[in-house]
Amino acid sequence: MYEFPQDFFWGAATSSYQVEGGNSLSDWWEYELAGKLKYHSGQACRHYDLYEKDFDLAKELNHNCHRLSIEWSRIEPEEGVFSNNELEHYKKVILALRKRGLEPIVTLHHFTNPLWFSKLGGWGCRKSPEYFLRYVGKVVEALAGNVRFWVTINEPMVYLYHSYFLGVWPPQEKSLIRAKLVNDNLLHAHIKAYRLIAGIYKDKNLAKPMISIAQNMQAFVPCKPTLRNKLAVYLRAKSYNLEFIERSISAGTLDFIGVNYYSRSVVELKGWGIKNFVMDVCDGSHSNLKKNSLGWDIYPEGLSSVLMSLKKYNLPVFILENGICTDDDSQRWDFIQEHLKSLTQAMNSGVKVLGYVYWSLIDNFEWDKGFGPRFGLIDVDYNTYKRTVRESARKLAQVSLNNKL
């Protein structure tokens, strides 16, 4: 039997662009309309209108927390112009969670940017942290009394990799120099946002909230045990998994470490150049591991290993995303069970874990992969928007009810 603390958080996550629908003022929407992206998000899951029904289902599944994101382009549709209607909408969303006993975990940036911000250079703009801070201040002032957990930036390294290394996400650039600049701007934005949020709560005489980032972490393993591969594994784990965390800790701006974990990355270098060390991977053709529908290896032991790499920082950890896209729901339940077992292994070794948030609550728009990948605990019929709870969700509901697997 695998047991969890009585105060453990159980929940699932969504992000605004992936589920709300109609986010027509963001950079992603413009790229979709221009044909620069293959799939169009459209009405997504209509969560913007149906959020109460979705939260009812989360409560039914014994969740006691829910992670969501605020869509910046809704709050600030034009530079310096803020929408009171949208601030009120998100207030209602947060209160709907509170009414159902779900602790909100609020993410302020989850990949998408306002169109006006993008046209000024996006995160490559020198003033980008200042623009972000202005938006953060408005949101936090509006929601402060009802939010204990804030996530400033979701997966900064994933954003960098897809937008500035591979060039498949907006702004579709391929530049190591730009990537370094954007990384620094995201870090400065997080540090300043942390201090701003903490200051707002102090000014309002509210208890200090828990503030962090959501860091995507991969279990890097060498394909062959060559010196070059081992060195690359070390450097990637350091730069991809840990650098943003360490720099945030050095600035005193992490109250916990938010972890998103999905899979491993098998490293096989083909040369000694910088790009080789950053990007070379094994094609995985000889791997006998089971895979999700996107072809990612299912590697539960990697969760324990990345958590153990965080133990030295002596901060609590919150699993903010862990999930599988699959058309076989029994595979989803197997995935969840094995990752929870791996999680307890790290906890029994001294890693303090606050909670487990599955990705995702409902099927959603999976960025450049469209609507094909099915991550949800809840099935969404994209023709009727009908929700159907999957059996894996009901099994996880028993775990969260009893705090044991």
Language-model regions, residue ranges each:
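Active-site region of glycoside hydrolase catalytic domains
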Residues: 1-35, 39, 59, 79, ...
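Chitinase-like catalytic core of GlcNAc-active glycosidases
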Residues: 46-47
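Catalytic domains of carbohydrate-active enzymes, especially glycoside hydrolases
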Residues: 50-71, 252-257
